[in-house]
Design a protein with these regions (language model features):
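Core AdoMet radical
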Residues: 1-7, 15-36, 43-75, 88-98, ...
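A general structural detector for well-ordered alpha-helical segments in enzyme core domains, enriched
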Residues: 10, 38, 69-80, 107-111
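A structural motif corresponding to the C-terminal end of an alpha-helix
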Residues: 17, 44-45, 76-90, 114, ...
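Alpha-solenoid helical-repeat scaffolds
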Residues: 51, 143, 147-151, 182-188
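Catalytic cores of alpha/beta
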Residues: 98-115
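PAPS-dependent sulfotransferase catalytic core
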Residues: 137-163
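Radical SAM enzyme core and accessory elements
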Residues: 161-246
Length: 246
């Protein structure tokens, strides 16, 4: 369940006491279940901020957030984007880690071209996605990735930034059209500045000595779950090879 039963009781009590229109409620959730009951309760509050925890698209998100199913995520995206009241803000909370940093441009392009109504629209994430880093365990921290791989990732980011710069208005909702300039978009903290900042953070320390831990972790996960990292993350497949196997 998205929330425990007691949460509904608390919301009902706040509504009953007449305080709801003075209160902001925030959630960080994987959104597995979002019942109609909760949607109705949200309508009474001054503001509801729902940070939907999704880390990638398709099979990549299924792998990172095992055992999630992308088709279910899509249904929840649709529900949150179209069935929530106007006082509800929806953002994507992406945990940037060693498995998904290379594929963030794919996630962003999917989000920008999906045709969302209000999900993570300007000014949130500059109309893209909101991010935070995974710091622990160390073998999933982006600093574990070798520089030669980060070179490829940086190249991918710069190619995407060029595309996003040409299509920046995709993340600006109808109610902000004509009110946001490209200069403002370029200067946004969570836009292209954030993307380049992620690469800088990944290069800030060299933790590639922990790659053996990364390989062991992924290999054990695949054996336990019946998943296939190499197939799911093809650009990263070679990172599982021992140095003398390359």
């Amino acid at each position: 369940s998205t929330v425990i039963e007691e949460h509904y009781t608390i919301l009902d009590k706040v509504i009953e006491m007449g305080y709801a229109d003075k209160i902001e409620v925030r959630y960080n959730s994987n959104g597995i279940e979002i019942p109609d009951r909760l949607l109705e309760q949200w309508k009474h509050f001054q503001k509801v901020r729902f940070h939907y925890s999704v880390d990638s698209i398709g099979e990549m998100n299924d792998y990172i957030r095992y055992p999630s199913e992308w088709e279910h995520n899509l249904r929840q995206f649709e529900l949150l984007d179209t069935r929530t009241s106007n006082n509800v803000e929806i953002t994507i909370a992406c945990a940037v880690n060693a498995l998904n940093i290379h594929y963030i441009p794919d996630f962003l392009k999917w989000k920008l071209t999906h045709g969302f109504n209000k999900t993570n629209m300007w000014p949130f994430g500059a109309g893209g996605i909101n991010y935070h880093f995974v710091y622990w365990p160390g073998h999933l921290n982006v600093k574990v990735l070798p520089n030669e791989f980060l070179d490829k990732t940086e190249k991918k980011y710069e190619e995407f930034i060029e595309w996003w710069s040409d299509n920046w208005e995709l993340g600006v909702p109808s109610w902000h059209k004509g009110k946001v300039t490209k200069e403002q978009w370029l200067d946004a903290s969570y836009g292209i500045k954030r993307l380049r900042g992620m690469i800088s953070f990944a290069r800030s320390e060299d933790w590639s000595r922990r790659l053996p831990e990364f390989r062991e972790y992924i290999t054990k996960l695949d054996k336990l779950r019946g998943t296939d990292f190499r197939t799911t993350f093809p650009d990263m497949a070679y990172l599982l090879d021992e140095p003398d196997e390359k």
